[in-house]
């Protein structure tokens, strides 16, 4: 893990409550901690001039959606991002999807879900229940985009939006 990632990760508060969507008030407590962690991550990214995603959720915090973007050669590539919180959360990490990239890379599952099994899922398992959505973005989606998006651009598979 590079120093930039380590410093970004240290700035994201850890979650303390082990709760999933079925856990009532405990889930609401965890959801509050997740929002605080996401806000801290976004503020840290903006301060570091590395702002790259925007997220919101339904009222129960079980369906998340937003935008993420990547700059390549001074051109912005923007994508819809979405995921559901699994019933077994936080033991099971959310499966983050970029639907418009579905089928465009081998490192993706059906529906545009990005492949995180080799690198991120073991890290998530070791850090359950401390990791949350902000950690999944910092250690999962961010590195995935850093590898996959430039490759897709260079191959001419994706184009910037007009």
UniProtKB/Swiss-Prot annotation:
Keywords attached to this Swiss-Prot or TrEMBL record, sorted alphabetically, are:
Ubl conjugation pathway
Residues of the active site are: 115
* UniProt GO MF annotations: UFM1 conjugating enzyme activity; UFM1 transferase activity
Q: Which CDD domains match?
A: UBCc_UFC1
Protease is among the record's keywords? no
Gene encoding this polypeptide? ufc-1
* Protein's name in the database: Ubiquitin-fold modifier-conjugating enzyme 1
What family, per the record? Belongs to the ubiquitin-conjugating enzyme family. UFC1 subfamily.
Q: What does this protein do?
A: E2-like enzyme which forms an intermediate with ufm-1. The intermediate is formed via a thioester linkage.
User: An example of a Gene Ontology BP annotation on this entry?
Assistant: reticulophagy
Subunit arrangement?
Answer: Interacts with uba-5.
Superkingdom of this protein's organism = Eukaryota
- Cross-referenced Pfam families: UFC1
């Amino acid at each position: 893990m590079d120093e930039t990632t380590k410093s970004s990760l240290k700035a994201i508060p850890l979650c303390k409550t082990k709760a999933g969507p079925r856990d009532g008030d405990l889930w609401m407590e965890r959801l509050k901690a997740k929002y605080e962690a996401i806000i801290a991550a976004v503020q840290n990214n903006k301060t570091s001039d590395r702002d790259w995603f925007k997220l919101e959720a339904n009222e129960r915090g079980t369906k998340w959606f937003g935008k993420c973007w990547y700059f390549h050669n001074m051109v912005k590539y923007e994508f819809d991002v979405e995921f559901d919180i699994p019933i077994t959360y936080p033991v099971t990490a959310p499966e983050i999807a970029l639907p418009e990239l579905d089928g465009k890379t081998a490192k993706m599952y059906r529906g545009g879900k990005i492949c995180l099994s080799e690198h991120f899922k073991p890290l998530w398992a070791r850090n359950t229940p401390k990791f949350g959505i902000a950690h999944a973005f910092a250690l999962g989606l961010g590195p995935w985009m850093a590898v996959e998006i430039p490759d897709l651009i260079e191959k001419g598979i994706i184009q910037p939006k007009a």
